[in-house]
Regions:
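Short, Lys/Arg-enriched anionic-surface-contact patches
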Residues: 7-28
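Short Lys/Arg-enriched helix C-cap and helix-to-coil transition segments
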Residues: 71-86
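Short alpha-helical "recognition helix" segments of helix-turn-helix
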Residues: 46-49
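Major-groove recognition helix of helix-turn-helix-like DNA-binding domains
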Residues: 55-67
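Short, functional C-terminal segments
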Residues: 88-98
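Short, amphipathic alpha-helical "recognition" segments used to contact nucleic acids or chromatin
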Residues: 23-40
Length: 98
């Protein structure tokens, strides 16, 4: 992708997703950034450490997010919903066999 070198697209059950080349999806990087307590460059460094990425790769994800915020926010929402459904199913199963 010419505007965002280092970003590629993966196909999967949830559709086409922006991702770092040889790395996590952009939405995963953004989600980690939202969850760290730090802000600014320290937040980027913290996310890089958590994800075992170079700071420059986290910055690539941030740059992509700044241009496609709505798309990435929708992917985060979909992932959160899928996680909640899976946890609910697990709890129901545990109650059934408890």
């Amino acid at each position: 992708m010419a505007d965002h070198p280092g970003i590629l697209f993966k196909n999967g059950p949830s559709g086409r997703r922006a991702a770092l080349a040889y790395g996590p999806d952009v939405w995963e990087v953004v989600k980690v950034l939202r969850e760290v307590d730090e802000r600014g460059p320290v937040a980027i460094a913290a996310a890089a450490e958590i994800l075992s990425l170079d700071v420059s790769r986290v910055t690539l994800a941030v740059d992509y997010y700044s241009d496609y915020q709505e798309e990435i926010d929708a992917e985060i929402a979909a992932a959160d919903e899928a996680s909640e459904r899976a946890e609910h199913a697990w709890r129901v199963q545990r109650q059934l066999i408890a």
